[in-house]
Amino acid sequence: MKLKRILLSVALLCGIGTTAMADKGMWLLNELNQQNYERMKELGFKLSPEQLYSLGQPSVASAVVIFGGGCTGITVSNEGLIFTNHHCGFGAIQSQSTVDHDYLRDGFRSNNHVEELPIPGLSVRYLREIVDVTPRIEAAVKGAKSEMERMQIIEELSQKINAEYTKGSTVVGEVTPYYAGNKYYVVVYNVFQDVRLVMAPPSSVGKFGGDTDNWMWTRHTGDFSVFRVYADANNNPALYSQNNKPYKPISYAPVSLNGYREGDYAMTIGFPGSTNRYLTSWGVEDVVNNENSPRIEVRGIKQAIWKEAMEADQATRIKYASKYAQSSNYWKNSIGMNRGLKNLDVVNRKRAEEKAFEAWIAKNNSQSTYGHILPGLKADYAKSAAISKDINYLYETLWGGTEIVRLARDVNSVGRIQAADMPKYKGRLEELYKDYLPSLDVKVLPAMLDIVRQRVSADCQPDIFKFIDKKFKGSTEKYAQYVFEKSIVPYADKVKDFLNLPADKQKKILDKDPAVALFNSVLPAIMQAQDKSEEMMLNIEKGKREYFAASRIMDPNRQMPSDANFTMRMSYGSIKGYAPKDGAWYNYYTTEQGVFEKQDPTSSEFAVQPEILSLLRSKDFGQYGVGDHLRLCFLSDNDITGGNSGSPVFNGNGELIGLAFDGNWEAMSGDIEFEPDLQRTISVDIRYVLFMIDKWAKMPHLIKELNLVKGDQRDLMPAGKGGNCSHKKAQTCAKKECSKGKKCAEKSATCISAMKDGKPCKTEKACAAGQKSAEKKANCCSTMKDGKPCTGDKDCAKSGKACCGKNKEAAAKKASKK
């Protein structure tokens, strides 16, 4: 450990990256440049660009899918088998669960295709095509006189372009902005709507650790679930039919049993949802104060009410499990983000960037071109602060907090439903009521109303408070009881009867319904608040667009990947642990031992079924084990955010080694500021997934369906066998370079940081022991006159003699005297 620390210190002094340093960013595969690719090869990537990404052809990326409405998945067999996270499949598993068949608690396994469960409403999307439509957008907006007009033009043209690429419900085109609105692509997908549940572990595995461990390392969660995509007889996307057959994909991922070592190449491909890496300091403050803070307060109160009821009743737990998980995920994310932004002093980092931008403007006499950008953003953020906070409080409380307002919206829309659409409308309502409890929501409503009264500006509050004050003397609890006693909206049976009435009778009932009255008060309040903020928000978007474009001109060599927007991206890096704080170090993997250390039968988050504990205790890990242990989760320094859940993690050969499911607590600020020393992706080891499928679910037919890759196990490779080189400070290297006991491997961590010119060490001689070793040359960085890396003999000392030759000690003494 001490030697590693010394090496790292030398590398930092030299200003040369180590092999384990990822490139910041979520890269567009269709824009992958030579610089990216060369760096990927340095880190250990072995495939060609075409093998990585080639739409319509077999490639690594062709097997990656959008799973549902906000996750990623990976195709792993020639019969449409999909691996994704347990929390991504959680809603699907919950939808099939009952008290008698509790698949959340007990897990699910199918013995054949017939037993696989269709999931209504679930879809999987395969990327079909990406087309640059920027010229069409730019030509259309050229004459726009305002940001509002510009937005309307883009929206209308986008709808037209979408229609050009969309074919029914199975091929969908979506125009999407990139680079802060400076570029536009239409992204086209094949949409498969017959997706079936194949296998899911018990929640004690798939959700082990619950909210306590969410966003945390160490982790011991088997966060995976298994689905299958079905297609019609011609292998085309289709709606559900018993006649459909398993989909034959263009590509599917090989699954590696060979493991990984620290420093090994790791790559994720997925659909990250949203990042804001190019915000100004005022934008960061807006996120902290006006977005995250309302979310933290409101969801904390709502979730406490839900949790008490869920722990008291099994049926309630099943109904609200998915809702609670979705709510708490971003509640804890917001807490961690605010903490991280403060700890990393991100606001002042952004201010430093702004000062550099202003200095560049002054140096280039560009005040007339760019001088308005930052002052405009500062002013617009200041104007929008109060209304932004009001909007977020209204959304979190009365729109997203209590459920009755949106139910009232749906019931109230009955008059606009055409006869042909009525069956679909009734089916949607039935799904909503299936997981709704009026007895619980009646407790949430007054809590949400109280927050609105306390936090939202008086002129933005819904006028329902006048009624509450007049009739109930301000008591929100009495008002809530009144709503739930007098309204038909909270009760599925009453709504069902209501839908069978003539239209005139329906209107009379709705006109008098107190829940509908609440909806008719809340909606205008939100819309009015949005109207007030719209111009300011559009001006902010304009400023962000201009700031991004100008920043690229200021520093044309700076790599500025587009922010995430739920389109396909790649992140490359290495398997790597991290230091969460001074004096602490987190290992890069966990094992089954941690389950025994954490498990607690008295805790709903850490209770594990005896059969699972017995299975792990038996150590019958077979081909999935590492010695007498089973690796459960691991870390890599890939870039991750929401939407990446379920993203495949590939090794340098394009083989699946894990499924990404989380980020770490110390780097929750990563959506705004990527911190390479801290930011880590948490993934479930694919061998834990296979172990549960094989040994727990006893589904050998699924294991046979996979393309398993077996070879030398990376985890156990000794020195000289493709693991640690025999060179005393080398960390990783290619097998062929170390198989004969060479002291140095091509592109090893030591040699990259050690060579005078920064290039990889390619020969044994370059790393041999003695005065001329690359290892020793690294020490010369400290003898530089200006403290910068040694790049030539003249730079090292005043004498101008050799950087690391016989005069090394003399050079060092001269430098120290200076």
Curated annotation (Swiss-Prot):
Signal peptide limits: 1-22
Domain notes: The C-terminal Lys-rich domain (711-818) is dispensable for the proteolytic activity.
Record protein name field: Dipeptidyl-peptidase 7
Xref: Gene3D superfamilies: Trypsin-like serine proteases
EC number: 3.4.14.-
Family: Belongs to the peptidase S46 family.
Gene from which the chain derives: dpp7
Species this protein is from: Porphyromonas endodontalis (strain ATCC 35406 / DSM 24491 / JCM 8526 / CCUG 16442 / BCRC 14492 / NCTC 13058 / HG 370) (Bacteroides endodontalis)
Disulphide bridges, residue numbers: none
